[in-house]
Structure formats: C-alpha cells, structure tokens
Amino acid sequence: MAKGKRDKIRMVSSAATGHFYTTDKNKKNTPGKMEMMKYDPVVRKHVMYKEGKIK
C-alpha cells in the first residue's frame, strides 16, 4: 500500500497546559513547523499552538 502525502501532527499549546489538538498537514506544501492561534479551554484564551509529533 502506498504511503499517504499527509502526516498526522499534534498542535501543542504554548501556555504549558498540556492541551493539544490533532490535525494533519501536507508534507510537500508545508515543510516547516506549523504555528497558529487556537482556543485553549484550560486557560480560556486564544494562545499560540505549535506543531509536535504524535507519539
């Protein structure tokens, strides 16, 4: 079976709450690390989420 073009990634909160979102990204179009502002329900604010590996 062929390997897919998208990798599953984990978006980890920079607020150090341990909260994360899972998503996927296209390896070819976005080779660098993703960063985006998302809502962290633990601190009840929008914070920066950075890409991490799924274990």
Curated annotation (Swiss-Prot):
GO biological process: translation
Keyword Ribonucleoprotein appears in the UniProt entry: yes
Xref: Gene3D superfamilies: Ribosomal protein L33 (2.20.28.120)
Keyword entries, A-Z: Ribonucleoprotein, Ribosomal protein
InterPro entries given in the database record: Ribosomal_bL33, Ribosomal_bL33_CS, Ribosomal_bL33_sf, Ribosomal_zn-bd
UniProt GO molecular function: structural constituent of ribosome
Signal peptide positions (record): none
Gene Ontology cellular-component terms listed: cytosolic large ribosomal subunit
Sequence similarity: Belongs to the bacterial ribosomal protein bL33 family.
Protein name: Large ribosomal subunit protein bL33
Species per Swiss-Prot/TrEMBL record: Xanthomonas oryzae pv. oryzae (strain PXO99A)
